[in-house]
């Protein structure tokens, strides 16, 4: 599983990094995105949907860290 660590980064950087990871991934790959910017809770799911990918898991971890698990279901250009 590829991990995108956006802890300590604020909008729009987590979205930029998540998008780049999705663009560089192959169909079928799983990406874990970690962020602690509260805006990411809404921004990342919107990005995933916009790019046609699948958000398979979301959870709030300790210390305000948000964890998103995304499955790449189609190529992103």
Curated annotation (Swiss-Prot):
Active site: 11 (cysteine persulfide intermediate)
PROSITE patterns the record matches: UPF0033
Highest taxon, organism lineage: Archaea
A Pfam family that the UniProt record links to this protein: TusA
Positions of transmembrane segments: none
Signal peptide positions (record): none
Family: Belongs to the sulfur carrier protein TusA family.
Protein name: Putative sulfur carrier protein AF_0188
Native source organism of the sequence: Archaeoglobus fulgidus (strain ATCC 49558 / DSM 4304 / JCM 9628 / NBRC 100126 / VC-16)
């Amino acid at each position: 599983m590829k991990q995108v660590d956006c802890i300590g980064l604020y909008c729009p950087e987590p979205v930029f990094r998540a998008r780049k990871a999705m663009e560089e991934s192959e169909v079928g790959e799983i990406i874990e995105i970690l962020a602690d910017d509260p805006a990411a809770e809404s921004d990342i799911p919107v990005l995933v949907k916009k790019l046609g990918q699948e958000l398979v898991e979301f959870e709030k971890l300790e210390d305000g860290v948000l964890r998103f698990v995304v499955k790449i279901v189609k190529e992103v250009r």
